[in-house]
Amino acid sequence: DRFMKEVDSLDDHYFNTTILVLFLADTKEELSQIEEKLKNTASLKSLTLKSCFSMQKEALNSVLIYGIQEFKRVVNLSSSCLAMFMPFKTQELNDENGIYYGINQLSQNAIFADKKLLKNHNGMILGQSGSGKSVFSKSEMISLYLNNPADQILIVDPQSEYGPVVVKMHGTVICFDSKKEFYLNPMDVDFEGVDYAGLREIISEKADFILTLISSLLKRDMEAEEQGIVDRVIDKVYSANYSMRKRLNGENEKSVEYEVPEFMKMEVPELSLSENLSTEEQVRAYSPTLQDVYQGLLDEGTDLSDHLAAAMEIFVNGSLNLFNHRTNVDLSNRLVAFDIAGLKDNLRVTSMLIMMETLRGKIRKNAKLDRWTHLYIDEFHELLSVDQVANFVLKLWKEIRKMKGIITGITQNMSDLLNDENAGKLSAILSNTEYFALLSQSSVDKRKLMEFLPNISPAMFNFVDNAESGTGLLKMGSITVPFDMRMSKGSEIYEIVNTDGGGYGV
């Protein structure tokens, strides 16, 4: 009756089961020793092991992978009892077309995972200093590069960490400082195929960016009147630029609601249609710059607009005017690193914000081409240190999925990332994140992570408690597995990804 109830009511199943243990030895004496040890170990668990006298051949054939059961002695076990035996209780991660993430510490099987299969593709790579976080990140980038030939990988590199890997993979490293003439224009915009509604969306996004930029410089939220001035200036700048580009391409200017300002009409004869510029060349040659916004604020002629213009001056006439030039770098390479280590520390966050606005445009362009973009941001916690910038990051974190983009934040300063001031925004970021690579964590950081990631069991979190370098937990959606991504010190890939002389080779 009990068995019938378990089957009918509890949906249990029973199986005819044979459990055989195969062990080998070089000598008969060693064989006897192993047999005795196994029997003693089993007896501690109230199990009895018996030798297969006169049935060695049948037992051996049953153990082998032929799927033949010649050993006919069976016992009836329920599915719940069978679940206690390995490997049935071991979680595996083996996505089709996934990239390699090391060895599962429990089953010793390889881990293959694909972020594109997740509902929310964004991720975080977290680990304290010396945990192997940098090597893990570089290994992931290399696997992505080799396994996804159509995708583009973009890296924001505040510490000159990724240059050697990018160069080895024939990628492009762009170093930004006042001594080098590498320029990115955050105001670049592609108007190809953009109608009036699309123009309004672009104006809204660029106004949001400039508002965030000025707020980060002022270290405060902007007043409603200030926001109105900036919004009006951005509207004028991009509406005029849109109308001018329409004329350059021989399109009917009446299709938009804006006329070309007189000062821009003066330039039209120099920009003849005979130049036959490509879309990319038009974007670089004719997009507005921060100078246009700065001049627009001055043209407003009020004390408040002059104050806002003064806040922007460092990016126009000051030490960070490298962002006030037309783009002159090639962003077409599949692997591009933006090295901003040469920028001043007190302006690094603002510089990262400008770079992210530029990269958002690149991601949107890739999306039009049905191309995936992977954006890695090292020292990610710095972007959350300024409230206005954190809001911008949160918005991009949410919307990038629609543009076939994947953001991966990399950070080691967990205490900064998880402080009370950032808690609200971090919760919003984590709720839109399904990929986590957790390497070694301090006890304090582990407790905070357990609060933010309640779906990972305390037992699993033991794998990151002061773990060995190169080991930790990988969470992909609902699946969490402990990984071991240590590699041989003699391998070529180890020489490429290891930059600190220690690494986590074995």
What are these regions (language model features)?
Residues 1, 56-86, 128-129, 277-278, ...:
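C-terminal regions of RecA-like/P-loop NTPase motor modules
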Residues 1-81, 86:
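Extended, folded cores of ATP/NTP-driven motor/assembly subunits in large transport
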Residues 47, 58-111, 116-117, 160-172, ...:
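P-loop NTPase motor domains
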Residues 125:
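Hydrophobic anchor at the beta1->P-loop junction of P-loop NTPases
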Residues 133:
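Conserved lysine of the Walker
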Residues 136:
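Hydrophobic positions on the alpha1 helix immediately C-terminal to the Walker A/P-loop
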Residues 143-154:
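Post-Walker A helix-loop "phosphate-sensing" segment adjacent to the P-loop in P-loop NTPases
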Residues 157-158, 378, 402-405, 410-419, ...:
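Conserved H-loop
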